Amino acid sequence: SRRASEEEARRLADIDHLTGCYNRRSFTAALGDLLTHLERREQALAAIAVDLDNFKQVNDLHGHQAGDEVLRNTAARIQRLLPDGGILARLGGDEFICVVPYHPKVPDRVDQLATRMIEHVARPVEYGDTPVDVTMSIGIASSTQMENARDGEDAAERLMHKSDIAMYHAKKQGKNRFYWFEPQMENELRFRNELEAGIRRGIANGEFRPYYEQQIDLESGKLVGFEMLARWESPEMGVVGPDIFIPIAEEIGVIGEMSEALIACAFEDAKEWDAELTLSVNISPVQMRDPWFAQKLLKLLVRHNFPACRLDIEITESCLHENVGMVRSMISSLRNQGVRVSLDDFGTGYSSLSQL
């Protein structure tokens, strides 16, 4: 009948086709209803945001069908653990969220559930003959942390947002763990987002500047060159040190662009020095994952007409373990052009020099 087919159409619009869970739209509506009818003293709701760690690697290594199998498995494992009245949704990609009722005086129940979810999802998923491993990060937010919890879908969105912020915090703390939402997490996240946006702007506006530290030969006491360091002269934040902006630039994928601009400036500066002095530059392990890194660097040397023999590239030991073949061929092509390549880990790395 027409009515039955309309209901079926509505049901299909409300579920995630891959896992059979709710989707974002139907979950938000259901959570809104639950919040509206909550008896505040006797009941609370915990929104539990779940995100798989390094899921992209599963797709890259094993293909999308393996990824889909992991998502279906994850949904089934979480669903089995949920108490009565719990609802699970897949929000998209590898993001899930569930809501569970609990007594506000017994939040440990929710802790236990989160711990079990993490344990169950970490068990390998069999895909063909290959066991596929994933872990997950969880953020939890409680209806007790909200004003105006009865605003239906609006309150649902706010509660979901809080659980998402806590989940992001769990990722930052090293993944494979859970955190309850705390208000300062919101400020940390806002600051982090401002930093990211500032770094992107700063690269475009040339706010990252090289400065130099002397390198002295310990035996002769003679100045042999300068090491290039970087600082960010930010109009909003003043001078920011590399310990803050380098890790973020690596994470958001702009370290290569930033480093090339700094090196280009440094080549121009170093042309003014005595021709005996070398320029030493630290290269991030993230840059060494770019198969074109050596080509880009050699191009910069030519463009700025800077002698390769005056350039000393310092890489860290960890670069060598990630992709020995590619790193080795990049180092060879740099050395063939006369660039010095040294390992910078203060004595720990020399065992790996033999690999080169």
Predicted regions and their residues:
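Cyclic nucleotide signaling catalytic output domains
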Residues: L88, R116, E126, T130, ...
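Short helix/loop segment flanking the catalytic signature motif in cyclic-nucleotide metabolism enzymes
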Residues: V70, I97-E119, I140, E147-G152, ...
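Catalytic core regions of nucleotide second-messenger enzymes
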Residues: A89-L91, V106-D108, V121-S137, G152, ...
